[in-house]
Curated annotation (Swiss-Prot):
Disulfide bonds join C134-C139. It is an enzyme of class 1 (oxidoreductase). The lineage of its organism: Bacteria, Pseudomonadati, Pseudomonadota, Betaproteobacteria, Burkholderiales. It comes from Alcaligenes sp. One of its GO terms (molecular function) is flavin adenine dinucleotide binding. The active site is a redox-active disulfide bond. Its cofactor is FAD. One of its GO terms (biological process) is detoxification of mercury ion. Residues 1-64 form the HMA domain. Keywords: Disulfide bond, FAD, Flavoprotein, Mercuric resistance, Mercury, Metal-binding, NADP, Oxidoreductase, Plasmid, Redox-active center. This is Mercuric reductase. Homodimer.
Length: 559
């Protein structure tokens, strides 16, 4: 049965209408779309249309019966509603293509949409908030907070203080948080919930999934009960959660992970940060710029896995802003007494009003019962996959942070898309040889390809050049010359194989380096390209030119 509905103004309206319709006797399930102004219902014979319109009218909207869509669309909808969401204890496809189960709703969305595009029917299972980590408690809110902190920093201090009077910004964290969360909600509705609501080939179950065997899942529904989902193919894309180190006293204290830090409506006067992960450094600087006195406890140096110059540059920038960076320092004990954290280290005690623990993320796989499906994981719980995202059980796939792939949302989405292609009969692999990475500190850190040490480890002879930003016109015009651009080439061929950059806009230049490496360009070919003058990406051209000339002796825009 189908209804046209007028008067709805948002996705929440559609949710209320759905709830009301599903309370009408005889209604098995309802799919309500605010953008389309429609409802699609699976009902028992004899269900009263008048009861349906009355239920909608009771919410202040108007509903009128509508013509059914095409036979194929109707069959797909009823197959979903009656077969997967009906009163039975089995959920499965209706025979019109493969039935794919997707566990997760963050980057897993890319896989679900690609599977539908390939002709499959999808059951998507999410135990938490639709959208996963990135949009809800990761990339999006953190970058909003970082941007707000950057604005606060520039008001307090900038290279133009001689002509623009500096001022101490008044920080209202509660208002910043409201602005941040409003954008998060907007993106979640637009890019996840709304898309799912409007796709009749995707059924969403809210609950926690575990494998019964290699062909079915048991889903403990959030609103009670359990449902069995049978599948032809399955994708595990459950992401990762903050890892907490086994420091005595830590678990008994009210510490923050990044999740709590991003939704805090207060700025602590003193913040201690355990860890030197990307998340630790981004949030440490953001809180410092919003008013906290920040101390970072780093087990080694910052960015110790990268070219040493990167860690040195960021450490210098942090210390210049008053952030304490304690290298080779670990907490052996954490106590929380009278509202104060006390961290015991080999160099004495550190006291703080709040403690952020950001030592990395662990795969969300412990509750999946992977062994029941014969799916192998490594010692850290990460699912082992091949280049086609297949697990040790070939018709079960995995992608993203729950695997041993690099923990970036764009890697997870790309892996999920390729998994969907493969599970529907295609052949796609994920090539990470030119994978960009960006850290949103200030200055930013961006890398792609080999560092010199990595190349030497793989037996590649290299040559390299490092261009400091005082040779880049954009940086000079900005009066901000912190950082450098380093190019690594294969000796002999001159082919570009790696780029490392520390610069305020490093993230905006790295994709050009990705394309150069992907297309096997030589450093001379890169130097010969036209780059817009007074852009930061022009620094790539200048760095390439340093292999054959002294750029200090060139005019500003020398070709």
């Amino acid at each position: 049965m189908y209804l046209n509905i007028t008067g709805m103004t948002c996705d929440s309206c559609a949710t209320h209408v759905k709830d009301a319709l599903e309370k009408v006797p005889g209604v098995l399930s309802a799919l309500v779309s605010y953008p389309k102004g429609s409802a699609q219902l699976a009902t028992d014979p004899g269900t009263s249309p008048e009861a349906l319109t009355a239920a909608v009218a009771g919410l202040g909207y108007k509903a009128t019966p509508a013509d059914a869509p095409s036979t194929s669309a109707r069959g797909r909808l009823l197959g979903k509603a009656l077969g997967w969401l009906g009163g039975g204890d089995k959920a499965g496809g209706d025979g019109d293509g493969l039935h794919v189960a997707v566990i997760g709703s963050g980057a897993a969305m890319a896989a679900a949409l690609k599977a539908v595009e390939q002709g499959a029917n999808v059951t998507l299972i999410e135990r938490g908030t639709i959208g996963g980590t990135c949009v809800n408690v990761g990339c999006v809110p953190s970058k909003i907070m970082i941007r707000a902190a950057h604005i606060a920093h520039l008001r307090r201090e900038s290279p133009f203080d001689g002509g623009i009077a500096a001022t101490v910004p008044a920080i209202d964290r509660s208002k910043l948080l409201a602005q941040q969360q409003a954008r998060v909600d907007e993106l979640r509705h637009a890019k996840y919930e709304g898309i799912l609501d409007d796709n009749p080939a995707i059924t969403v179950l809210h609950g926690e999934a575990r494998f019964k065997d290699d062909q079915s899942l048991a889903v403990r529904l959030n609103d009670g009960g359990e449902r069995v989902v049978a599948f032809d193919r399955c994708l595990v894309a459950t992401g990762a959660s903050p890892a907490v180190p086994p420091i005595p006293g830590l678990k008994e204290s009210p510490y923050w992970t990044s999740t709590e830090a991003l939704v805090s409506d207060t700025i602590p006067e003193r913040l201690a940060v355990i860890g030197s992960s990307v998340v630790a450094l981004e949030l440490a600087q953001a809180f410092a710029r919003l008013g906290s006195k920040v101390t970072i406890l780093a087990r080694s140096t910052l960015f110790f896995r990268e070219d040493p110059a990167i860690g040195e540059a960021v450490t210098a920038a942090f210390r210049a802003e008053g952030i304490k960076v304690l290298e080779y320092t670990q907490a052996s004990q954490v106590a929380h007494v009278d509202g104060e954290f006390v961290l015991t280290t080999g160099y004495g005690e550190i006291r703080a009003d709040q403690l952020l623990v950001a030592t990395g993320r662990a795969p969300n796989t412990r509750s999946l019962a992977l062994e029941a499906a014969g799916v192998a994981a490594n010692a850290q719980g990460a699912i082992v996959i091949d280049k086609g995202m297949r697990t040790s059980t070939p018709h079960i796939y995995a992608a993203g942070d729950c695997t041993d792939q690099p923990q970036f949302v764009y890697v997870a989405a790309a892996a999920g898309t390729r998994a969907a292609i493969n599970m529907t009969g295609g052949d796609a692999a994920l090539d990470l040889t030119a994978m960009p990475a960006v850290v949103f500190t200030d200055p930013q850190v961006a890398t792609v390809g080999y560092s010199e040490a990595e190349a030497h480890h793989d037996g590649i002879e290299t040559d390299s050049r490092t261009l400091t930003l005082d040779n880049v016109p954009r940086a000079l015009a900005n009066f901000d010359t912190r950082g450098f651009i380093k190019l690594v080439i294969e000796e002999g061929s001159g082919r570009l194989i790696g780029v490392q950059a520390v610069a305020p806009e490093a993230g905006e230049l790295i994709q050009t380096a990705v394309l150069a490496i992907r297309n096997r360009m030589t450093v001379q070919e890169l130097a010969d390209q036209l780059f817009p003058y007074l852009t930061m990406v022009e620094g790539l051209k200048l760095a390439a030119q340093t292999f054959s000339k002294d750029v200090k002796q060139l005019s500003c825009c020398a070709g």
